[in-house]
Structures are given as structure tokens and as C-alpha cells.
Amino acid sequence: MREILADVMMDETGDSLDHYRLDYNRLAQGKLESVSRNTSTVKTLTVTVRESDEQAAVASLNALCNNLVSQMRSIDACKATRLDREHRLRLMAEVLRPGEEFRFDERRFEHQPGKPDTKDLVCPWSIDARNPTMLDIESLDSKYLHRTMWVSGLPPELSDQLVNDLTGLRARVDVSIHLAPMDRGESMTLVRRKNAEVKMQIMDQRRTNRKQGLDPDDLPDDLADQQEQLGQLRDELRSTNQRLVDSIIVIGVSAASQEELEVACRNVKAKVNAQSCTAESLKFMQMEGLTAELPLGNNPLPMKRTLTTNSAAILIPFTTQEVFEPHGLFYGSNARSGNPILADRRSHMNSNGFVLGTSGGGKSFTVKQEIAGMFLNRDDEVIVIDPEREYLALAAAFGGQIIQISAGTGTRVNPMDIVLEDDSASDPVKDKTNNVVSMIGALIGGIDGLDPLQKGLVDQCVSNLYTRYRNQGGGVVQPTLQDLHDELQAGGDQVSRYLADALNPYITGSMSGFNGQTNVDLSNRFTVFDVSGLSGELRTFGMMVVIDQVWNRVIRNKANGRRTWLYVDEFHRFFSNQYAAAQFKDIYKRARKYGLGVTGITQNVEEILDLQDAREMLSNSDFLMLLSQNSTDADALCELLTLSEEQRQYFTGVLPGQGLMKIGSAYVPFDGRIPAGGDLYRLYSTTFQEGK
């Protein structure tokens, strides 16, 4: 529990926001304490091969490992990473020296004098094995008791719940499953031999019955059952790809005291018994049991249980996808396992994503939780485009900047602003010119947009303005819409005058709010663009201007080594206009190279799924949060994302704040709900009654 809290909790920094960090920690700790499990589980797979020489063994092992990594990707997007020596030794040290700092360093080890042995770095200083049912293990900084048990009895029908239950115990428990598969020839030979043995027993029993004057066919039930089961197994091996596997399940329990050890072992036995199995202590074989526990693929124990491959597959512990990424944000608990979800969007192919859900499904609440975790614990910059005034209170509380964008305010954001210091390979003047042409097309182009001649004239005039601006050394005074109007007017031809006249209402008329130099601070770490006052033809244009300003900010942040996060609420509005849709798609595609993560938020799932560009963005995103959906939208999302019926149930008919989360290639059901009350909850909540 302490290790998990250390990954989740925020440190105080001494600024005015520390009371929010403390509230965040209170909510996170309360969430962790309320879920069914607070365990950190490490799952490893050790593969061993036997060949005639070391070179052949290495080649065989490499091929087998590559094949296994590929195959495991198909198990609910299970991501397997091959461990190097340092990581293998760390695993050993966690079992043999729990609580001690792991001190192995590959470079220092290679240059140590003499012949150093890695065993000296992971083995305990002493092991007292005089007690036949437990070991007393001691090292420099740790002393603990250890008992190894094995699952001696398995039921006729196995369940995958056994390993899951054991790893969920709040104790130091190591579960090792040894599987030694036989080839098909060995499997058939073993079945034939067992079948012959049972037949001999049946013949002996019949002779005994005759001597006693009994019916020769009156056989004990166990013999008849064995014969029937062996016949079924023989037929199954002949007709399918089934093979036999020798197996044993070993369970190691560690504790600081005898009392704690006995309690933990009783809990282990209770979990095993609940699955119709039996667990026994390895009396007089504790050292061998400890060896079998370690991730070495070495099993010196003589006991085994022979299973078919189908039965053995049930024991594989990769049944529940978990997301616990280093330096990740806390997103609540895994709805299936109860374990915490820590995800780091920065560590994936791209940081872009979407939050989708019906009205009242908890979209803005969930997004605010992520923003708070990001803003309070990192130096990243957060920008929100807010058409419904959902994020103003959060920005104000965190000392952010709220910029109201509308025609009637004194706030001015210049759509012609350009950043010339772009260290990318592209030409900033060319890129900005394309953006301005798109914005002008959205503003005065109507439904069909600008025709090629009009587009060419606007392109030429904008390019002229920026070329002169760059040749003059840039500076504070940027080109404006007035300058573009004058440049078009100076063209003299009919089309240029038409375009200049079309711009007039946005230069001197009632809708001239975007004409002039930018007069607001755009350097705050948390900026909310309030676009609720935009309507009519200015809505699309205004949102495009904001996106363009965001891109300018992203360029500056990239130069300063700072990551930017853009949240676009009701992002489907961008797809109502061809120019706006193209602009949003462009920034979405370029985001990764500039350290930008774009998050689209909407309840209009059906609308965006009708658009091919939006569908491609959704299907290629590394981050999705699917909150409660109606049946129609849920079906469409399942088809697009190839989701199963089981996954579908996690985002249909669920409570606000619950849903299905995609991070990388993993899909995890999540529960992000927090109890009402506290400073952050009041900032997150958008419920009318709670907001009063």
C-alpha cells in the first residue's frame, strides 16, 4: 500500500496551490482504501530450453522469446518486455531481500576486481532452515520469516480465479506456476501406459470378484471413472492439438513475525479452498520450495500434476489488463480488479485522445480530474477551448488566465499573429499563410468556401505581409486583418476589391473584435478560451483563431522544452466547416513532434462517427475514455474499435465517472468516481444543484 501511495501522491511545493495537492492526496488515498484490492502485482514468464551446447540453446531461446512476445500481444493487448540481467536480479532481490535498496550496477560490476558473483548481490546473508515448515531469512537491512506451500489437490474443473485471488491478498505472496509440456508422442505414450495400468487393475479386480462369487463387472467407481477419463483423453489427444503438461503451483508467503505469517498462510489456504483446491506446507522441503519460487525456471520439487494444455492455460495469470505506468497520473481504480490505474500519456506513440460520453456521463468532471493531476504535479501548460463555460472556475482557482472570445468584448486576439522562431524544418511563413487562408475562407467563403482564384489572391496578399514583416526583423507590431484588407484593396482588380469588401464588417463593423493587435496575456500556464459568446459566422472563425493562437503557443513551448496539453470541448463543432475540420486534423497530426497532446471532448458521438476524418482520429488514438453511451453509439464504437461484448458493458448503463479507458493498446474498465465534498470536488462538479 505504501509503495502504491508513493506513486500516486503529490509532493507539496510551498506555493498557494498546496491545499489542492493535499485534497488531491486525500481523495486518492480514500479511493485506494475503498477499493477491494490495494496490491501491486508483478507478472513474469520464465522460459527454459535444453540443447546440446550453449550456442544452440541461446539461438533456440531467442527465437522462442520473440515468438512468445508476439503471441502475448493477442492476450488482451498484453505487453511483454524481455528482461536484462539487471532486471532479473532485481526480481530475485525483491524476493530474497525485500525492503533493501537494490545496488547492482552493470557498469560497476563489470569493472570490479577479481571474479564477482551476482549471487552475492541478491542472496540473503543467512537462511535458518531448522524449522521444517518455514525459513528464517536475514540480510543487512531485513529479517523475515518465509513459508512455501504447494497446491496439492486440483478439482476436475479448473477456474482462472485461483491465481487472481492469491495475488489480491494484502500480504507478501509469490505464486510460481511451473509448466513442463510434453510433445505429442510423449503425451500419447503416457496415456497408453496409464490406460494399460488401469486395465490391469480392472482384470485383477474381476479375478477377485470371481473368486468371491461376485459379478465380474461390479467394479469400484474410481476404476470405472479412470478408464472412461483415459479413453476420453486419448480421443482428445488424437483429434485435437492438445498435449499433456506436468505442472505444480508453488506459493511463497513472507512476514515479519510468526503471527503475521500464520495469518497470511491461513488466508492463502482459505483462497485456495474456495476454489476447491488444497494447499499444503512443503514440510522438510522449504529450501527446495524457495528455489522453485524464484523466477529461474528451476523446479527441484518431485511433486507434479499432469494437465492438458487447455487446463494448464487456465492457470496463466494474464487474465486482467492492468495499467500502472511510472510517473503516470491517477485515473481511479480498475473496475475489474480494483487496482489503481496510473497512466502516462507522454510515454505512448502520441499523446492525443478523446473523452466521449452522453450528457451527464461525467465528461467534464473526468477531464478536470486529469487537468488537476497534470497541472498540480508537473510543469506542463494546459489550454482549454471552452464553449460552455465549464472550466472557468478551475482556471480561476489555479491562477489561470480566462480569455473571453466574442465580437463585443474589448479582448482582442489577432488571427494574424505569427511566430517566426520555429526550429522545425517547415517554413513558418508558409505554414501561417496556409492557416490564414483557411480562416479567411471560413469567415467569408460561405458554404462552398473560396474559389481557386480568390484563394490564390488571399494567399499572395498574406504572404506579402509576412515576408515584409520578417524582412523588417519581426517585432511586437504584427500584421492585422486591417493590413490584409488594405493589401487586397491595393490589388485593384475586381476580385481583390470583392474580397476586401467582404472583410469590411470584420474590420470596422460590429464584428471587428478580431481586428487589431492581441491585447491579452497568452503566457499563463493555464489558459481557458471562453468561446461561449461566439455565434453565427464568427463561431467557426473564432474557434479557428483560437486554435491558431494555441499553435503559436505550442511552438514557443517546444523551444522552451515545455509540453502543452490542449482540451477542446464540443470538438465536433470543428467538423461543421471544411476549413475548420482541416485545421483541427492538421494540428492533431503534427502534435506529437511539438510536444502537444490534443484531447477532443464531445457527447455527439453519432455525428463524429459519420465523418471519415473523425473516425480515423478515433481509431488511431492512443488514449480514449469512453464514458456512458447510449446503445446506438455503443454499437458504433464497438464496430469501429473492435470491442467485445464484455468491454461494451463497461460503458453502457454505467454511473457518471465510470467507463472504458484505452491507453496505448490496452483497454481497461475504470471507476473514477470520488466522494462529494472538498475543494477539488466543488471545482470538478458541474451538477446544477451542487454548483449553487
Q: Where in the sequence are the language-model features?
A:
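Post-Walker A helix-loop "phosphate-sensing" segment adjacent to the P-loop in P-loop NTPases
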Residues: 373-383
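A short helix-turn-beta junction within AAA+ P-loop NTPase domains corresponding to the substrate/partner-engaging
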Residues: 399-403, 613-626
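Hydrophobic anchor at the beta1->P-loop junction of P-loop NTPases
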Residues: 355
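Extended, folded cores of ATP/NTP-driven motor/assembly subunits in large transport
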Residues: 1-317
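Hydrophobic positions on the alpha1 helix immediately C-terminal to the Walker A/P-loop
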Residues: 366
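Conserved P-loop NTPase
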Residues: 641-692
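Conserved lysine of the Walker
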Residues: 363
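P-loop NTPase motor domains
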Residues: 24, 167-168, 182, 187-191, ...
